[in-house]
């Protein structure tokens, strides 16, 4: 009975595979939105104010960071919890493939969230005259919460490894 239960629990890790595949569909949706933004801004690039162009570029950077985060979570999550990826060595292989455990993934996700939050905060500050002081304060508080959380996670990870 114990062996059956253990085998069933071990096999249940495959339930994560469609979730990781779903993230790839999210990546596709993000790519479509990215190119929609590019197509929307290109005809107006010569008439846009510099600040508005910077806001669009920050939005594109934000989307690329989210896309990178999706790829990282998808691939390393699959490798850590479902099955090892069998990529032919003759093909291009990501340098971190097979080397990122759940702890390092957690730190990379935290760093990515801080970077994404920083870009969003910069975008908010560029439009600060149209945003109330209370909202600005909450944006900063939320961003600092992400920053402090990332530092605490890094510190805890460091002291548990030693």
Swiss-Prot record:
Belongs to the UPF0114 family. HAMAP family: UPF0114. It comes from Pseudomonas entomophila (strain L48). It is found in: Cell membrane. This is UPF0114 protein PSEEN0819. The keyword Transmembrane helix applies. The chain crosses the membrane at residues 15-35, 53-73, 136-156. It is a multi-pass membrane protein. It holds the Pfam family UPF0114. InterPro entries: UPF0114 (IPR005134), UPF0114_bac (IPR020761). One of its GO terms (cellular component) is plasma membrane. Keywords: Cell membrane, Membrane, Transmembrane, Transmembrane helix.
């Amino acid at each position: 009975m114990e062996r059956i239960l253990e085998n069933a629990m071990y096999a249940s890790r495959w339930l994560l595979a469609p979730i990781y595949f779903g993230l790839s569909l999210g990546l596709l949706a993000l790519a479509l939105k990215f190119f929609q933004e590019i197509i929307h801004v290109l005809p107006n690039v010569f008439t846009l104010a510099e600040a508005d162009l910077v806001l669009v570029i920050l939005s594109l950077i934000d989307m690329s960071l989210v896309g990178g985060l999706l790829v990282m979570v998808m691939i390393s999550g699959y490798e850590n919890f479902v099955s090892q990826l069998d990529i032919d060595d003759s093909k291009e292989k990501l340098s971190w493939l097979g080397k990122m455990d759940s702890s390092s993934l957690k730190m990379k996700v935290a760093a990515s969230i801080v970077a994404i939050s920083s870009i969003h905060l910069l975008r908010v500050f560029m439009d600060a005259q149209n945003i109330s002081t209370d909202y600005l304060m909450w944006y900063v508080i939320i961003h600092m919460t992400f920053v402090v959380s990332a530092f605490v996670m890094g510190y805890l990870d460091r002291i548990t490894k030693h």
